[in-house]
């Protein structure tokens, strides 16, 4: 039986975070830059869309004005991001999961570096997702056959009820360096009989796959759900807020920028060196994400 993915996302300002979901996005061409994968317009969150809901928007730059016929392949993946076996493309995609071109193209104008901006949204007239799950999108040059990048996102259905709480009163310390998650899920709508085999649970700090806690054993199990309380696997280092910087103008430094220089071909912005913060300081930030 396929394992449905239950992803519990923790998004608190006090939790250290970076856009570690990017480890599942891999650029393989030196000409490709600025890859962004966004659900709807919510660039601050992980790329998670609801089935038949908001679109997944993918954009990137090719650092040339040369014509490339970029096409994409969409693959359904298991909870561990391996490609799903035993299903057909027609099971998860209405239309074409492979071979469609990316036609939304815009060339740069009056820029120091030439680039061509590409945009792709799913669903589109050629492809509509029919099944929830993890998805990997591979973009390749049809003429040369080379993969230029892969991008990953999730499509979910609200079939499981989840609740959670986060506290600084942990089994390690109180109001110091750690935070602890308590979570509960109710899967009565799914008719699950063997949760250990049929559920795949993931708890993350602000989308950080590098510190994800996967399939932690629950403290309590009922006929319709699981509950985690005082679970040592759900204790996270609190960390601190990210230091921010903004590159808004090439004529003078802006927030977090030491200086901006011109080498005759490109502008280079040097980020100001900050001292480590010995104690937690609240500063509203984007949790390591970026906006281009």
Set out the residue ranges of the language-model regions.
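Extended low-complexity, serine/threonine- and proline-enriched intrinsically disordered segments
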Residues: 66-96, 193-216
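Ligand-binding face of N-terminal immunoglobulin V-set domains in extracellular IgSF glycoproteins
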Residues: 114-142
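Bacterial Sec-dependent N-terminal signal peptides
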Residues: 1-24
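Catalytic cores of secreted or luminal carbohydrate-active enzymes
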Residues: 239-292
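Aromatic sugar-binding surface patches on proteins
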Residues: 101-104, 109-123, 222-244
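Contiguous beta-strand segments within globular domains
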Residues: 33-78, 174-185
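Low-complexity, Pro/Ser/Thr- and charge-rich linker/hinge segments at domain boundaries
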Residues: 27, 155-178
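Short acidic/polar inter-strand loop motif in beta-rich domains
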Residues: 79-81, 127, 141-148, 208-210, ...
